Amino acid sequence: EDDQVKEATPAEPLAETKSAGAAELIATLEESGLDVIFEHGVTVGEVEGLEVARIVSGENGDRIDVGVGAHDREAFGLLYGELPTAQAIQQVANVVRTHRAPGAEPHPLNRLGSERWLRAHLISQPERVGMRRLSAAAPPIQRTNLKEAVPAVAKGVSLDGRDTVIVSAVGIDLDLVPFAADARLLHDPDAELKIAVPQRDAHKILKDLV
């Protein structure tokens, strides 16, 4: 009957999508000191959790576009299109690195992607969350732009040898716990799941949801 309650059937988890980018372009990002992140078919280079370069596909093949976000990449290409790619990356990365360093003065560049900044610092210091090693992983849903606050996912091995998925977030997000569960389902349903937030955001509401 229409008024009967039935058990919900979960959908199949999303498959990981192969990211675009020729090996030499990925190597350029790495040699420029960027963290190379693969998410849902997109390959980007980040500094302290903020995208500063992206591999894009065009009529003439794959290339690296430099800049923070789509509009900045377009503007940077118009103004500095003749710069060698590595030099262009370094120019943008140096500016971003200055503003995203711990203790930096408030600036638009350190207000974007706070959750990814947190993930980047946990990856560089995994022992802070009881991990032996960590690497960035794709979220269960794709971000549509840099201003969209989507929890950042990482996976790795804990100090006691357990496969673990860690989801980082900043602020109070009532969808964080189900999001984290979906992230584990995507990467490893049998893994231990941890949620990392700043101390100020470890609210009782979040603990109750967990």
Report each predicted region and the residues it spans.
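Charged, terminal alpha-helix-loop-beta segments
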Residues: 1-210
